[in-house]
């Protein structure tokens, strides 16, 4: 009997737009992944290509070997933090079973995610069954467990852990709520008192600054600047540093929203050399009808804000889109942080320049369908919101030395005001 690693999975679309529907089959056989649409899906009026590399054709599709899977399924899989949890669990299980640890690949990470917290609206189950993969009850524990989750995540963020009994206990607590999430920092899903799904982003053992508090500060500035961001909160639990909590935007009143990263929809393998103008072009070509113009202005506002606050780790997986009734909509902003370790943005501001400059942002106004006057107004609104960044940092309890250390991230804002 073959393991889950070598069985075909039914791929279901369960979004807020229509009843759940089987859309295809994703198979893994001897290291090779293939996908094929269900013929009933191909015949439906609402059918759409899940991924730019998966056209609506009745044929098998194979991903690029270097990726190991299609972008839309990679978006449903964990990034570095979730992968770290899974790798540590596999190493511990291998030790307990007196065997060599398996090397985990893209397929393993996909099937290792809990269904309840999986990003987006795709769900997976073994063919012939009616239970979706990953149905543990504690995939998103209640907010009352947040203190325990933070404490465990702090321990698991260590590069080396020698106490295997402690590791076993910690993984039992955190793998289910934490393994679905992207990014490199420790985090976990949890359920708020009103039933909404949230993410807690925790301090790491090697932190030398209050990363969570800074994300909260920038979140508040973003709200003032007219940036679309989900609700958020800041708590201090076991640590000198804070935990930043933010509501999941891919859930609406309990329903799932179909989400894809900019990396996937732009058919990219990496972000270097890419530009914000490519995101604008995607919205012009594939945006959701009546709101496409507003989304383009929101994207321009977001570029200006990222430059003003030094959010320079702005790679294509940190931008995304959710599917609307008539096309793609710009997803709310997420993972926006002042970055003191990068002098330039990952994405180019115009077609070639990734240096942080609000003047460069202004020069791109026409690509977003904005007049020069409207663009100047938007940038001024953003700059006015960011003017208070020092006061906001102090109110969040960030130490004065940390404020001065982070000032370089706001250099483009300072230059604009000079």
Question: Over which residues does each language-model region extend?
Answer:
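Phosphate/dinucleotide-binding and metal-coordinating scaffold of catalytic cores
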Residues: 1-316, 320-418
